[in-house]
Amino acid sequence: MKAWLRSVNESIKPKFMPGGAQAKWFPIYDAIENFIFSSTHKTTNPIHVRDSIDIQRIMVIVWLAAFPAMFFGMYNIGNQTLDYLTLVGTANTNDWHHALINLVGYSNNSFLTKMWIGAVYFVPIYAVTFAVGILWEILFAVVRKHEINEGLFVSSILFALSCPPDLPLWQAAMGITFGIVIGKEVFGGTGKNFLNPALTGRAFLYFAYPSQLSGDKVWIAGLSDTGIIPEGFSGATPLGYAAEGGLQGLTDNFSWFDAFLGNIPGSVGETSVIAIGIAAVILLATGVASYRIILGTFLGMIVMTSILNIVGSDTNPMFQVPWYWHFVIGSFAFGLVFMATEPVSGSGTNAGRWIYGALIGVTVVLIRVINPAFPEGMMLAILFANLFAPVIDHMVVSNNIAKRKRALSYE
């Protein structure tokens, strides 16, 4: 089968090469060829390469590493939705999601039913995100006459996982459009962007359409459709409770272990620290993620949280929240593993990665605690650090050069 596919590919390849009838569509042909086959280019001369990893493999590893968070996110959507609809009933639901869910029904509280409900909400968001993103990638590749790389696989799944389950599909299209075009392509494409494309798209949605990205009605699928909030029920996330009641507000409504497992309202892929931890192991073991950034961010968060705990406040209950709660609520774990470690927009020097990570950890706590307008600060903290990454690397390199010059002057 593989040999037959290779022969078919070789027979049509001349049509897409320079001078061929379909030469203008070479980026599309090249993307399909690279997706199906491994590269045919072989190096014959001695080279200075320690690993065979390339952009294609890096992107595929990150994409696959996001699967545990994705599958748990779908389960959690189904679980939260069934719990909510048990209270309000299904008679009040009338959008297209529930028409699809009714193919299976709400009565069965099984694992597969919960996965189906989660898939009904998440898969359309991911499909629209990927389809719109690939259209923009193809357009820029054809116009600029360069290859289509696998970066969209990562940007699309991370963007979709960072969204609430009830996000309108047209907003998903708008968000990924902004992330791909403004966050990446206008700067030259993959490898030249200084902002994380997925986070750029989500930040655009957050400020352009705040009612769909924040509040108490967007984190549980179906709640925004019915608009019914039963007595004693809230769709607020742990961060929402923490902003109002501090540590007491958290412990009155959630256990730390539930937050660690991910059985809480939130964005699709951001709730389960265990699922995200699996991804962290994969990315660290393959060398895709930098342990310096992860540890730097984690330590920065602990230090800043501890300082604020000691300082305290009589008017702001967020000062009471300890570091081990900050770790399991909001998008801290997701942003730490998938967004902060993105190699293009982050620092490239070893010392710079420690500083870059610490900057993220300190900033996310300051935004969460000090700024009442943004109870979740991970997105803004990473984008803020993205802006400083080139400066950090420049300072590290300049300092190393100055050290070498001083050392030479003593010889």
Locate the predicted segments by residue.
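Loop-to-transmembrane alpha-helix initiation sites
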Residues: 173, 194-198, 323-331, 353, ...
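Long hydrophobic alpha-helical segments that form multi-pass transmembrane helix bundles
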Residues: 191-277
